Amino acid sequence: MRDGIIGAGNWILDKVKTIDRWPGEGNLCNILAEEQAGGGGPCNVLFDLAAMDPALPLYAAGRIGADADGDFLLAEIRRRGIDDRFMARSAAAPTGYTDVMSGEGRRTFFHCRGANAELAPEELERIGFPARFFYLGYLLLLDRLDAPEPRFGTGAARVLAAMRRNGCETVVDFVSEAPEKFAKTVCPALPQIDILIINELEAACCLGKPVRKTDGSLDETRLRPAAECLMAGGVKSLVVLHYPEGAAALDKQGNFLTVPSCELERARIVGTNGAGDAFAAGVIYALYRNRPLREALELGSVSSYYNLLSPTASGGAVDFARMEEKRRSCFGG
């Protein structure tokens, strides 16, 4: 029986500055607090999963620099009991990092890709480990995986195909980018993805039109067409869309459902860094435990709820018992 989850892709040190306001260009704001923590898709997802279930077999895969920032990330990985056998260190590039400006419930990122830009398809293809899930994130931020590849279209598609041949279910996230980059880089990977978990802005790249109205409100009528577009592009099993108001999912049988978010007063939101990854972690854990799809979306929402109570990407993560209690209070059942 396959067991465990591999998290591969961007490993980043988030250097979070909590600011008192958002200044206009040329103006000044005050930094109220500073904190550093692991970031990037696989880091956030695995750290959240480790908090939910410390006994869950987790494996980190990616590239970091041979520097103090890399030492910090490795220490954080090991502290959580995550296996680091698939982590490589670069002598030429620094550990990827992001200066995160967080305030008033918003965030802005200044990113250095560093060693993540060196992560090559063959490094991940060599992982022959029989895990149940292989998570890869973020497409469009991994230079060599985003590069063209003659057989599969991109390096990422090649890696995902290899993981599926090995018997893993593939789970993918990507970042918001221009539609032309989506078509060139993400579309070739869709047929190699079992489960796609993205936000509404990223889904709009496939649909070719916004899923929000001009006043900023969500156009719910476009959620299903966006999910259907991604499924038609080749996603094998499940498309999950998340957005501040809630989440939606479309499975391969054509079943479509939505759930609202857990309500949280705006004044209690400390930061939104990693909220989407927290949602993904909740969904992945629920699917790993064979929970119904509706409960998976609800647990994703609960995971995001706790994420919003911390300035860092995984600092708000809690154990599954607490998540389940919150899920029942928010959604019933």
Regions found by a protein language model. Give the residues of each.
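Conserved post-catalytic alpha-helical subdomain immediately downstream of the catalytic base
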Residues: 233, 262-331
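Short, charged helix-to-loop "capping" segments that act as catalytic/coupling loops
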Residues: 38, 42-61, 140-151, 234-237, ...
